[in-house]
UniProtKB/Swiss-Prot annotation:
A Pfam entry, by short name: Ribosomal_S6
Cellular compartments per GO CC: cytoplasm; ribonucleoprotein complex; ribosome
Function, in words: Binds together with bS18 to 16S ribosomal RNA.
Family matches, as InterPro entries: Ribosomal_bS6, Ribosomal_bS6_sf, Ribosomal_S6_plastid/chlpt, Transl_elong_EF1B/ribsomal_bS6
Encoding gene (name): rpsF
Protein name: Small ribosomal subunit protein bS6
The entry's keywords: Ribonucleoprotein, Ribosomal protein, RNA-binding, rRNA-binding
Biological processes, Gene Ontology terms: translation
Organism: Corynebacterium glutamicum (strain ATCC 13032 / DSM 20300 / JCM 1318 / BCRC 11384 / CCUG 27702 / LMG 3730 / NBRC 12168 / NCIMB 10025 / NRRL B-2784 / 534)
Length: 95
């Protein structure tokens, strides 16, 4: 298994208290494939560098996880299908 860092920018209209439960729903993909969610860090609402879908702000979250590459592809697919997710970025961490 490899280590990955996932940054997610969520729709700012979503309440910050509901961010963690909605992230849990997405991260169930990782847990189902016997991966491990190491850390979830919700940064909160921040101003975007440039507008995304005519929105000036977004709710940032950073997730450290350990899983297989196929699991990351499936997680990215699930996140991109959701309308509440503005942007995602997955980075593979070096050992």
């Amino acid at each position: 298994m490899r280590q990955y860092e996932l940054m997610i920018i969520l729709d700012p209209s979503q309440d910050e208290r509901t961010v963690a439960p909605s992230l849990d729903k997405f991260l169930e993909v990782v847990r189902k494939d016997k991966g491990d969610v190491v850390k979830v860090d919700v940064w909160g609402k921040r101003r975007l560098a440039y507008p995304i879908d005519k929105k000036e702000e977004g709710v940032y979250a950073v997730v450290d996880l350990k899983c297989e590459s196929a699991t990351v592809l499936e997680l990215d697919r699930v996140l991109n299908l959701n309308d509440g997710v503005l942007r995602t970025k997955v980075l593979r961490l070096d050992k």
